[in-house]
Amino acid sequence: MIRFLVLSLLILTLFLTTPAVEGDVSFRLSGATSSSYGVFISNLRKALPNERKLYDIPLLRSSLPGSQRYALIHLTNYADETISVAIDVTNVYIMGYRAGDTSYFFNEASATEAAKYVFKDAMRKVTLPYSGNYERLQTAAGKIRENIPLGLPALDSAITTLFYYNANSAASALMVLIQSTSEAARYKFIEQQIGKRVDKTFLPSLAIISLENSWSALSKQIQIASTNNGQFESPVVLINAQNQRVTITNVDAGVVTSNIALLLNRNNMAAMDDDVPMTQSFGCGSYAI
């Protein structure tokens, strides 16, 4: 009888400690610190299969079959309310999310495909009235990214908005979600800027927006440089932390050696190039990516 009880407890313990889906990543805002946020982003990067490394930067896979193409991120706000976010592991692109028994997917072909594999047991499926393209989200929100606060308190508010699905502020919340997960995984600078705001918010700098808009271009040029003696075929212009334009021409630049943390595979670039606005306003003028 005692042996049976011990065996039963052991089985129960194994069941409870086994993650529901291999590769899932979780982050709780209650008690969160800069360090715990950094661990979360590190775990997210590790959950993304890579083809190989170029200049010590993981090159994401160009494709994966079926459900292997997707991973889940579980985010819990200060009120202990959780949403599960589905991402495409080939580009860290968010497909949709689930709150309770309802799933929400972007209005685009890639998200429709993802819905065949994730959140299939949700009792209700909602197609959002926009795609995950920043330009579409900014239009729906009625504001640009530069005017939407980031930081862990902002992430908490975004989770709450999405958990209860407030249609009026969902687009803004989704931009906070994208930048706090996908963009932070792509760039160490964005991870650090968000992670150090544990108890306050901030407006994203032009440097952050510049990096977000240039991930595809940087990824492409770094891949070209790997067979071109470290030189870019076409320069990439960024805005640095001092709001100055800088031209990146080779892999010795700081953005390559100590910032970009993931590379988009060149085979996936046509789709990603449609996902960011090609012209971003800076001050009184305009800066074309």
From Swiss-Prot:
It comes from the Eukaryota. PROSITE patterns: SHIGA_RICIN. One of its GO terms (molecular function) is rRNA N-glycosylase activity. The active site is at residue 183. GO terms for biological process: defense response; negative regulation of translation; regulation of defense response to virus. The keyword Oxidoreductase does not apply. It holds the Pfam family RIP. Residues 1-23 form the signal peptide. Keywords: Antiviral protein, Hydrolase, Plant defense, Protein synthesis inhibitor, Signal, Toxin. It catalyses: Endohydrolysis of the N-glycosidic bond at one specific adenosine on the 28S rRNA. Abortion-inducing protein. Inhibits HIV-1 infection and replication. Inactivates eukaryotic 60S ribosomal subunits. Belongs to the ribosome-inactivating protein family. Type 1 RIP subfamily. This is Ribosome-inactivating protein alpha-trichosanthin.
